[in-house]
């Protein structure tokens, strides 16, 4: 069973960029692995490091700034996750420790891949996202609370309601991935199989 997401509070990582594509999230040279772990170190590799070997950190990139160490909520702009479909993108984000991303829009294929990997995407208006960026700029290292049960983001004294597909909300709240959903009907599946002719079993 996947991990349940009900409510999460964490340090906010402000990635103030629009149209961040999946090749920026996890470059193609790291796509050979097929397990979900080990991708976090290579998240935003080309922006995060100044050398090809990944030994020299870029001090100006947000992931390398000490005030955002341990961040688990990302704040970004519109059309995050555009470009080619690669499930490695949410793998890299979750392996790094990101549990929720707040933005003003997400690419459809990325959104599907994120959901399949229990990564919550919260869509707010551009004005609301601007307000959140202003809060983080005024107080680097600030924490927000993302509450999936009440469908709202708490940022300081401000509350931002958000909408989410009811089915996806149900799955995230209950820790249900594709396998978990199937196992909910295990008894029905077994009963159907027993009814089939022996030559079909």
From Swiss-Prot:
One of its GO terms (biological process) is L-leucine biosynthetic process. Its EC number is 4.2.1.33. It is an enzyme of class 4 (lyase). It comes from the Bacteria. The keyword Amino-acid biosynthesis applies. It holds the Pfam family Aconitase_C. Keywords: Amino-acid biosynthesis, Branched-chain amino acid biosynthesis, Leucine biosynthesis, Lyase. Pathway: Amino-acid biosynthesis; L-leucine biosynthesis; L-leucine from 3-methyl-2-oxobutanoate: step 2/4. Belongs to the LeuD family. LeuD type 1 subfamily. HAMAP family: LeuD_type1 (MF_01031). Heterodimer of LeuC and LeuD. NCBIfam families: leuD, PRK01641.1. This is 3-isopropylmalate dehydratase small subunit. It comes from Erwinia tasmaniensis (strain DSM 17950 / CFBP 7177 / CIP 109463 / NCPPB 4357 / Et1/99).
